[in-house]
Amino acid sequence: MAGAASRRSTLTLYSLCNCCHCHRVRLVLLEKGLDPEFIWVNPASPPPDLLEASPGGHLPTLVDRDVVLYNDRVIIEYLDERYPHPPMLATDPAGRARQRLALARIEQDLYAQLPRLSRSVREERELAREALRSQLVAGAAVFAARPYFLGTDYSLIDATLAPLLWRLAHYGIELPPEAAPVLEYAARMFARPAFRQSLSAVEQEMRDDGPAARPPSSETVR
């Protein structure tokens, strides 16, 4: 795709500053050790180069030289194939399929609740909180089984779960004692340098333990 955005020589991500979908892409970029340019977008006034690259103004949008992608799931799988070290999906087909199924379940069962948490109707927000709370409690044993979710190595699943878990307190979701493995897992994910660097200024303020850290990448506000 021609145009100013696709002619960029750097890896560029157009991102919202408070979006879980955008956050997981930022996290994958940094876990890969890449040096992207983050362009923080005001959705009420998207920059012309974003609209040129992605006429719908989709966020997140990734520009990697002449490749322009949107849809966070598509982007993170592209990044794992385009920049294979460290690998963030299993090397065997069966392992990759299991991880993709897990990603689909997380998106369907957990990420799908996020829009409801911002609704104006209190009952709707509480239903979403309870849905997230109950599903995380039900999966506590899986979080306890291995150092990372479903494996011994950091994967796209971990990069998908961590941004969601970071937002629990912000949305008023408290987990009960039986979900301690979830909180222990979350603490390990939050301690990773790439996670600390992936946080926007807005996301840092979502929790009391938000760091005053900045990504090792250039940032532009549009």
Language-model regions: role of each:
Residues 65, 162, 201:
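Conserved residues at the C-terminal ends of beta-strands
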Residues 102, 106-198:
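GST-like fold's C-terminal all-alpha helical module
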